[in-house]
């Protein structure tokens, strides 16, 4: 009985989060692949973003009714609702930049550039004075070096293609604009880093994962719907035809935007941000395989070299963050041990 209890705890603590994080990376890449396939057939990315948010909002509404707690949602006049609205505006802008970036380049480039997120977050944390820069600290040195290496790797991917390593059967004559796509994807993950900082602040004052994600998607739906009405005046572009267009919207709304966000937030609570981040470079390999199979993308030497450099910088930043967190934990525990003895001396 005791062995079964230990096995169940191990399964729940380690196996479930591990499997969930791999599934999330596959889901994210799969959404990018389907979206790319849909846009190659003329599907408007504004319409895609709007319908994806609509689908996510409906799914999260159902989840909030089933699993939601009795705590009331923030009112439209509250400062919390304004922050969630700002979060939606940031998320929507980031997503539009990302969709356009994938349209100009490829899902593989998107997966590679996504590894810049920790470096961007570190830079923004310094800018907003949320991060203390101690140049003599090994943790700070690792984060600085990792940030520089990550950005260098991203530049290699964007600016240098090199010879072809894997030539797949191309299903389209679409000519990509690699540099423009790389810049847009860089903007996407820069905005996403700001999004993470604001989301962390919101979760501290309102720790309701499903409610926050639901309100976020609802606001994003309203904003994207307004933008879509202004940009896409041809009503025919709003039609969801059977095929990649419909599949990309359903897949993104059901799995990526809604359930993916909830599982990602759950993973942050269960295992922490460092553990979640360790799986990001895995998306590069997944994207290379899926893009070659389903889109006929060609793999270049520059993408491989840049991805290796970027992944090294990524893990260096993560190591520095983990080192900093462990140092803080040891320091706090030492202080908690010293305080009682100090009190006894005064008595």
Curated annotation (Swiss-Prot):
It is found in: Membrane. GO terms for molecular function: transmembrane transporter activity. The keyword Cell inner membrane does not apply. The chain crosses the membrane at residues 15-35, 47-67, 73-93, 108-128, 139-159, 178-198, 210-230, 243-263, 276-296, 299-319. It is a multi-pass membrane protein. Keywords: Membrane, Repeat, Transmembrane, Transmembrane helix. Its main location: membrane. This is WAT1-related protein At4g15540. The lineage of its organism: Eukaryota, Viridiplantae, Streptophyta, Embryophyta, Tracheophyta.
């Amino acid at each position: 009985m005791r062995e079964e209890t230990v096995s169940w705890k191990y399964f729940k603590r380690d196996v479930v989060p591990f499997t969930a994080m791999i599934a999330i990376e596959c889901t994210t890449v799969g959404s990018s692949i389907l979206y790319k396939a849909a846009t190659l057939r003329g599907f408007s990315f504004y319409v895609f973003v709007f319908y994806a948010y609509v689908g996510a909002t409906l799914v999260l509404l159902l989840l909030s009714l089933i699993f939601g707690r009795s705590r009331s949602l923030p009112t439209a006049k509250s400062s919390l609702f304004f922050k969630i609205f700002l979060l939606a505006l940031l998320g929507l802008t980031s997503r539009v930049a990302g969709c356009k970036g994938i349209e100009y380049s490829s899902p593989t480039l998107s997966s590679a550039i996504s590894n810049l997120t920790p470096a961007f977050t570190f830079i923004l944390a310094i800018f907003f004075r949320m991060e203390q820069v101690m140049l003599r600290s090994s943790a700070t040195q690792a984060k600085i070096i990792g940030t520089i290496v990550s950005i260098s790797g991203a530049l290699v991917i964007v600016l240098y293609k090199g010879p072809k390593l894997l030539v797949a059967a191309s299903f389209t004559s679409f000519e990509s604009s690699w540099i423009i796509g790389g810049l847009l994807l860089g903007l996407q993950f820069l905005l996403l880093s700001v999004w993470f900082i604001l989301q962390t602040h919101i979760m501290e004052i309102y720790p309701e994962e499903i409610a926050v994600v639901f309100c976020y998607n609802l606001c994003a739906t309203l904003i994207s719907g307004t933008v879509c009405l202004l940009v896409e005046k041809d009503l025919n572009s709003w039609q969801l035809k059977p095929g990649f267009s419909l599949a990309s919207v359903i897949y993104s709304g059901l799995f990526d935007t809604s359930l993916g966000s909830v599982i990602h937030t759950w993973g942050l609570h269960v295992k922490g941000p460092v553990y979640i981040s360790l799986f990001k470079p895995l998306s590069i390999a997944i994207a290379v395989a899926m893009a070659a199979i389903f889109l006929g993308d060609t793999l270049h030497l520059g993408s491989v070299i840049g991805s290796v450099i970027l992944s090294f910088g990524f893990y260096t930043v993560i190591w520095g963050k983990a080192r900093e967190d462990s140092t803080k934990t040891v320091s706090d525990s030492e202080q908690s041990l010293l305080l009682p003895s100090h009190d006894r001396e005064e008595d």
